[in-house]
Amino acid sequence: IKYANTIISYIDKVEGLDESIKNEYLGRAYFHRAYRYLNLCFQFGDVPFVSKIIDRPKQDYKSTKREAIIKKLVQDMEFAVQHVPDQKDMTYIGMINKGACRQLLIKCYLANGEFQKAKEQADILISQSGYKLMTETFGTFSNPHPTTWNITNNVIWNLHQGNNKVIAANKEAILVMPNRYGSDSGIRTRTMRNLVPWWNATSISTPDNKLAVDRFALTHASYDASMDYNRTFGRGVGVEIGRASCRERV
């Protein structure tokens, strides 16, 4: 919200900026602010609405009515839909595009009880914006661990393959933000560490003080490919192989 407000507050002071470019980036800033505030309104109801840069310590925040915030978000997103370009007219993937703005405007209309307007915008998004539901297989198919988890080629699998996320054949993608390890777009997250322990660490023990999880090398005599969910689903987020002493608890 702070970064969005920075753009909103200062964009008119940028000398020599073309009006269409200014409105394009202003619309994107409105998107980012509206996206966060819509989530806050649904999570907490009335919240303080900060629409400008806070340049000094402030402790007297007062909540704004949820209904008033949503009405403001509707106005902002109507502007964004008008001025932010379609993805096909943009150079970069990952920046806010018109389709994403329209989708957020639909949600704002629904939150504001303007159901007919929401339907009209949804019809445009579905039928007139170049998007459609994928019904046939497409893109790259991979079946990397057939012994553990054999995959038959299908649309859902194709949709969730990293190589298929941003290709032109994927017509379901409205706003895609690539985040790939080792690339310029890679942003490391701590989701895995926040949700599960470092399960293959030798310091994790069962209540009876035994090693909690076995992690066998591929060449180990006890390695069983049919149980290797770690390599199949990714770093232990699937099913882990526990010792007999902790299986009942699992």
What is the meaning of each model-derived region?
Residues 1, 99-105, 109-249:
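An aromatic- and glycine-enriched ligand-binding surface/loop that stacks and positions planar moieties
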Residues 8, 48-50, 81, 173-177:
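Structural recognition of the beta-strand scaffold that forms the well-ordered cores
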Residues 40-49, 133, 183:
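Proline-centered turn/helix-capping motifs that create local helix->coil transitions or kinks
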